[in-house]
């Protein structure tokens, strides 16, 4: 290729926005010409009604793979595969493989090459001279552009990964004047798969295809581990970068045979710790991690996260998600990928993003019905993640003797959610049932069954006296419910393993501690289980309204404030605002409280005497966080300073993350009447979830009894 023409092109565009500036923030837009009086569209299909495309003579292997995937997508959408055809309405170009003649033709189209030609992985899609023009700056950029065509046709990047088919469409077209340029905000975007038992050569191709659709370009190796050498043939054909010890290796050159190594400085290792694996972290907390500029690793600190180097005020070099159970983190992976490309991808908030993501998979009507199910699922799992229910994490503080049996009340919430899930499943078309099972039903049912298995086993252990289990009907009834949940969980997993002729059997994880048999004080036969189930606690009949048990206690979600006072403006005239954080915390709507901001609550109580005040915040996820202090003043008294941070990886830190809350308590003496509670953030990264004022100072419970 003759690069003189490119140089001429750059000379003509020196006054334009530089690619480096565009790359500092994802540039992604669609615009329509205002002076078009009668908007027209360009059809994707040719005269025969089949989608067709043309492409330059020489392309990289990953581009050819993307074209095959696009062709299959078009068959799913229109009923016919897309075919290469001279003069097609869709014209595709890989810039770094063009001949002089091809490049000259592209220049004449008038596409804004200067905005993306030197950016890695970038692409352009627009209309020119009655054609849909698709241009990639390099091999990956071209492949991503082709996958973007699939997305524009209604094929979600996560559809195939979750056995969902796109909505069929008779006609596909693009409006004249449409123009889109996308440049990744984060240069290296990918996954760390180290220690993943499911990762093998058989699954590499599926994983690489998922990465291509998500526009992820990097596999990360940690501590010298080489997972099957990352299957060199697949890695090379999909143009995937390999990163190890903060160095990334790229294959470059026109013939794609040169290796180039680059040192990475600022890296977000997302959920890399054993205590915070991606599938055990709320999507809302993942979003907090992505948006927090202090959540990163640097080469010089080597696995120590701290404040960004003074030399690096730019975007992170890499975002790497540590994945141990890829079938359970579809939403998180989609979110990470979209935000790595476009800093405004979640500007509407995670709740809106969840709605749009579900719509891309199930359609708008079904998505509106599914969203409340997922919101309740995230609330219940934020109270206790399934992985942290089982041993070796120990017994939880769920107490059957408080608030009319809070243990059974929590399980009843899961019962209601399961019923709603089954009822919705019946209304879905057959071709959405498998996808619904994988994205919605399996996570909900497995979490519910694990909770029931472990909490009822805990109850049986608490009730049974040593050596007397065979004669203790109450303990045996709880044990029977636990074993019944375990048997149902095994059936659920067996169904998943057979789904799609076993296509996911080597990927989904069914051997974790949370999947194992419950630890019980004795054994029961199948016949015993069936009989004892009849005498078990009846959640439909035996549970009374929570408000019945709320005497002498006031519990509130942080978002239920009476007044809120923003933090004083910073020296530059700006200050972070108080923000609600949907899908985060036991409240499912925690409050991010900037340093200096205040929440005030006013309430009435008829109780008199000593009381215990407990504050719950979202635990720190920054290992080098120095302070997370909150002051609490009750009725205008001297504020009590609560240090919410625990030493990283300490027992207290782990217990906070297992619970999903950091707790701090102190005691006060109050009269009856109206009271005020004032909560003020004294440091950054404070996210307040709930608080409780209990006049029964010795009462033990797990879930704050919020009645509103």
Model-predicted regions and their roles:
Residues 138, 524-708:
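Extracytoplasmic
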Residues 1-8:
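Bacterial N-terminal signal peptides that target proteins for export
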Residues 25-183:
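Contiguous, structured surface segment used for ligand recognition
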Residues 19-24:
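Boundary at the C-terminal end of the N-terminal hydrophobic targeting segment
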Residues 91-154, 206, 210, 214, ...:
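Intrinsic-disorder/low-complexity accessory segments
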